[in-house]
């Protein structure tokens, strides 16, 4: 009798321990668009990506990997986080190379140009570091990155994010955001994010062919040159630096535009190509009144235009040809194309009706897209 009672108690204790472990496992991270995008990268088949795009929010709002695949047949993915600091790029290149051998790295350089007037976003702070390291699998690269950039007082929380996020009452709800992606085993929308909005571009500057420059902040230039030195030392010849389109509506943004031109001058000193789409936007008929949801990010209309244009450049000028993927991988990419087209139809209807929403690949969004007929 006592043995049976002890057995029941033991079972209850074990059940409680398992429940606590599962709860911590589900809620220890902050679930947002950055986590879902980075987690999606690790779900891609090893060494299957032709192109990896590295950068900040412009990378995942302005370019669609699924639509580039549909149009040109090559595979790609955005390894990008919000406000991604330049100082993390070396670690992120190492991380990408642990899983993929891309034919080309496309590196967006807003982080170097966007620092000015006493503000330097090229350096690392706790928020943007966690957007990256919280979502990395444990590895020597993660340990090295945490050791280099985190403070000693809270270092443990970088390995056990539950310490940081357990007090967020919405985190348990958010933990279901990734259920669908984890069930399918791959990302359907390939990391893109957008808003259902058109933002008028009143007073937007005409910068076509403007090559004027402004100096970078000293720390930004230092970080840029150190990263370029790293690329040369690692014999990374397959790197294309870019400046994705932004809308310039005031003098402060114009100075950032000029710093972007200066970034290009520095990059060219190291023998790398730099494509600046801020002063060549007429080539793909960019509409400042319809193709942006704010000055820094294109909406789905701009995204479709830019993906088609830039994808063609990658294929025609940089030799990124149709990918030789397996039939199983092709089915997955075809499904991504299907769901991205559903997304465009869904987001387009919300945008035209004035229903303002932030859109990224959550389980809830995918369930809504299940009921959308492809456009």
Regions found by a protein language model. Give the residues of each.
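Secreted/periplasmic serine-hydrolase-like ester/acetyl group-modifying domain
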Residues: 123-234, 323-375
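Hydrophobic membrane-insertion alpha-helices, especially the h-region
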Residues: 8-28
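C-terminal regions of proteins
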Residues: 252-365
